[in-house]
Amino acid sequence: LGMLRIARNKRQYGEVVTVADKLLSESKLSPDLRQEILFARADAYFHTGKGENAADDWRELSKDTRSIYGAQSAYLLAQYQFDNKAIDTAEKTLNIFIDKGTPHNYWLARAFLLMADIYEKRGETFQARQYLQSLRNNYPASDDDIISRIDKKLSELGQTE
């Protein structure tokens, strides 16, 4: 596991995949370690242009949105789908994530921001603005970038009318 973390920190993505595959073949991994390894492999796949492989790992991880890896993976999977013009699929992924819930407010907020992007892409500016306003009114943290992302997006939406 140490080799995986070192390779990831050095952005040696090929090595990350190789080490992750070896580690994942072991049956005695705890669920937490398995998630960390899968997440590292997904990140490595994504950074080497193997988005579909990354999406497979994110899909598996997103089944458990109670974990930080699962919550982030649910968001990353939907973002990947959105970026690849699978708008309806991204919306379904986000709805599943939102319905499941997560204790990780940051990633849930990012999901709502992406949902607003989906509505904007469809020309449903009012709905996008509603998502953003609701998120702005209800987001508990102020020590991250969510509020500034919301404000930027609201400003952009205001300029489109």
Language-model-derived ranges and their functions:
Residues 1-161:
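Acidic, polar-rich low-complexity tracts and alpha-helical solenoid repeat scaffolds
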